[in-house]
């Protein structure tokens, strides 16, 4: 079976950590390659960086895209103060490359947005400020690449978080890492996820099977679906 539950993804991440495998640089590279395959160098890219590791992924992508000649702006509404260790290193690399961050969206729409606000771990409704930011991004009607899951969408249910439901990022593409939660394949999630892609981050089927154990082994099916 495929890696299709959030807890399976977490199990893979834990094994990678124990083995000393840094997945964030791989995720950021996969995102940067995805954008570069669809947008010419010199175009304006807006990277939305949240307060967790999803934000770290997008910061790695931002640094790589800037090095490739893209005009990259980073918006980090919560700032860098509480970033986890790996994401903090990604932030430091972005700053070392001359990058800066703003708390607010720019006045004009970019050519493409990378959504790295919240990942598969988000289980609470979006607050008012986050919702306002997402509404503005959606109103731009520009291509959006969501990393892991569109921010504001539950990876467990495939439905918008909140009661009443909020309004997630409406992605053109969703690039999942390691596995695609089954809920994101449900018909109701498609309107938010757009086209769905999977990157295994260079992890082998044997590694995935070891991580999730005999109750949820990943097979070569996942490998055949990998890559942006």
UniProtKB/Swiss-Prot annotation:
One of its GO terms (molecular function) is NAD(P)HX epimerase activity. Catalyzes the epimerization of the S- and R-forms of NAD(P)HX, a damaged form of NAD(P)H that is a result of enzymatic or heat-dependent hydration. This is a prerequisite for the S-specific NAD(P)H-hydrate dehydratase to allow the repair of both epimers of NAD(P)HX. Keywords: Isomerase, Metal-binding, NAD, NADP, Nucleotide-binding, Potassium. Residues 9-209 form the YjeF N-terminal domain. Belongs to the NnrE/AIBP family. It comes from the Bacteria. K(+) binds at residues 54, 115, 151. It catalyses: (6R)-NADHX = (6S)-NADHX; (6R)-NADPHX = (6S)-NADPHX. Its EC number is 5.1.99.6. This is NAD(P)H-hydrate epimerase. The gene is nnrE. It comes from Bordetella parapertussis (strain 12822 / ATCC BAA-587 / NCTC 13253). Its cofactor is K(+). Binds 1 potassium ion per subunit. Gene3D superfamilies: YjeF N-terminal domain (3.40.50.10260). HAMAP family: NADHX_epimerase. It holds the Pfam family YjeF_N. (6S)-NADPHX binds at residues 53-57, 119-125, 148.
